[in-house]
Amino acid sequence: MKSVRSFIRDDIQAMSAYQIADVPPGFAKLDSMESPVHPFAGHETLLQEWQARLAAAPIHLYPNPSGSGLQEALRSAFDIPDCADIALGNGSDELIQFITMLTAKPGAAMLAAEPSFVMYRHNAALYGMDYVGVPLNGDFTLNLPAVLEAVRKHRPALTFIAYPNNPTGVCFTRAEIEAVIEASDGIVVVDEAYGAFNGDSFLPQAGRIPNLIVLRTLSKIGFAGLRIGYAAGCPEVIGELQKILPPYNMNQLSLTTAKLALRHYGIISANIDSLKNERERMFAELGKICRLNTFSSQANFITIRVPDADLLFDTLKQNRILVKKLHGAHPLLEHCLRITVGSPAQNDAVLNIIRQLYCQPTDFL
């Protein structure tokens, strides 16, 4: 009798699953770019309204994402043009998967700068696309000539550009991204998962540029547990994407919470501003430590290069702080770690440990 594994695709058996860290109780979780606080914390009236709306949500009925009113709320909150259509996803990860499926014709190629979000390459492999990774420059800026040459040579059906980039935090220039869009015949996805921390967006161009999809999520602005992502683009493309999305891919509680949050976006925006201020404070303090290379970030995390990534990672973990060790993921990430911007107390704890490891006594004089 054949093993049941013999019926499973060989290429999938050869893959590794995405690793989610098991975080013990009491740890500061600074590895996944989550908000350090509940987005409604400190706003008792809003919390009460949220609880009442959750209690009234029709959880006995299948959700209708397209008729939920969430697209209209997103359009209003983020100035998405009327000419753009919006597709909702169970997190932007789901949309990355289905956009890949949408373009995965035999022989089609996907292009992305590297290092970047690992799920681009993963989905290319899953759906049989040729993957073209173009290395960034050593300072994590975009190697635009190399990208444009790869576009010319491989004619990718799908290109992903993370803006700002993950895991580096570095933001490519708007002119560079526009050049890639203009040079591409295929679809270009500008992945703005961290766009709220950048201050710039391609959302106003959604629906106006035929081959542009702008991808966003509510996860990084305090709602990672909701799993709500959205893609905005021209109706011709988004309409095709809608055909292959699962019919009930959102849930009633997430839809209810997201609509409420967008009606009170001023509170969410204030939380974002606080994190941006903490990011700049951390960047300034890390920059004072001469043995570190701290990369400028426009996201809610900071990437650093240290003399020994294993030593810092293990020391932080011994002190109940979990960050993301990037060392080994890509040659350009040698001895790099990614630190989510947490609460001021969490950030101070990280800074104190780094100072103990890497500051010389003369650094304090």
Swiss-Prot record:
<dbReference type="GO" id="GO:0030170">
    <property type="term" value="F:pyridoxal phosphate binding"/>
</dbReference>
<keyword id="KW-0368">Histidine biosynthesis</keyword>
<keyword id="KW-0663">Pyridoxal phosphate</keyword>
<comment type="subunit">
    <text>Homodimer.</text>
</comment>
<comment type="similarity">
    <text>Belongs to the class-II pyridoxal-phosphate-dependent aminotransferase family. Histidinol-phosphate aminotransferase subfamily.</text>
</comment>
<keyword id="KW-0808">Transferase</keyword>
<dbReference type="Pfam" id="PF00155">
    <property type="entry name" value="Aminotran_1_2"/>
</dbReference>
<dbReference type="InterPro" id="IPR004839">
    <property type="entry name" value="Aminotransferase_I/II_large"/>
</dbReference>
<keyword id="KW-0032">Aminotransferase</keyword>
<protein>
    <recommendedName>
        <fullName>Histidinol-phosphate aminotransferase</fullName>
        <ecNumber>2.6.1.9</ecNumber>
    </recommendedName>
</protein>
<dbReference type="InterPro" id="IPR015424">
    <property type="entry name" value="PyrdxlP-dep_Trfase"/>
</dbReference>
<dbReference type="InterPro" id="IPR005861">
    <property type="entry name" value="HisP_aminotrans"/>
</dbReference>
<dbReference type="GO" id="GO:0004400">
    <property type="term" value="F:histidinol-phosphate transaminase activity"/>
</dbReference>
<keyword id="KW-0028">Amino-acid biosynthesis</keyword>
<dbReference type="InterPro" id="IPR015421">
    <property type="entry name" value="PyrdxlP-dep_Trfase_major"/>
</dbReference>
<feature type="modified residue" description="N6-(pyridoxal phosphate)lysine">
    <location>
        <position position="220"/>
    </location>
</feature>
<dbReference type="GO" id="GO:0000105">
    <property type="term" value="P:L-histidine biosynthetic process"/>
</dbReference>
<dbReference type="InterPro" id="IPR015422">
    <property type="entry name" value="PyrdxlP-dep_Trfase_small"/>
</dbReference>
<comment type="pathway">
    <text>Amino-acid biosynthesis; L-histidine biosynthesis; L-histidine from 5-phospho-alpha-D-ribose 1-diphosphate: step 7/9.</text>
</comment>
